[in-house]
Amino acid sequence: MPVNRRDVVKAVALGGAAMVSDGASAAPAPEARIVHHVFFWLKRPESTADKDQLIAGLRALAEIPVIRNLQIGVPASTEQRDVVDSSFDVSELMTFDNVADQKVYQDHPIHQDFVAKCGHLWRKVIVYDMLTV
């Protein structure tokens, strides 16, 4: 039976679609992680030295091995809207593989040292911990 070009094109297209479909459905779901987001309000927000000391202390936390990602920042100068709270002075966002690693971080000597050396700088701290979905 002779093979024509249309049959070949159809077969290739169907095979390619099947491969894409199979590959997409076989992709593993991303693993859930713990995100630890902390907001700090300084006792003296006008003090550059206090802010710099807090940021330096937060940077030192990067040495804790269970931290997968560490971001440190200050309020962005984005559009002012009712839903945006930019009243904090410094924030840090960390990612952990699981709750056990977050506990290791909490108990780690570097974290304990950070709290001891920088705790006098802030008047308020709010923590949001979440499990990614």
Feature map (PLM): residue ranges:
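N-terminal secretory signal peptides and thylakoid transit peptides that target proteins
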Residues: 1-16
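Hydrophobic membrane-targeting signal helices
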Residues: 15-20, 63
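C-terminal segment of N-terminal export signals and the immediately downstream linker at the start
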Residues: 20-49
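Short, glycine- and small/hydrophobic-rich beta-strand elements in well-ordered beta-sheets
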Residues: 23-28, 62-89, 123, 127-132
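Short, well-ordered beta-strand segments in beta-rich or mixed alpha/beta enzyme
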Residues: 33-42, 73, 78-106
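Short amphipathic alpha-helical segments
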Residues: 46-72, 109-119
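Surface-exposed, polar helix/loop patches in the mature regions of secreted/periplasmic/lumenal proteins
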Residues: 94-132
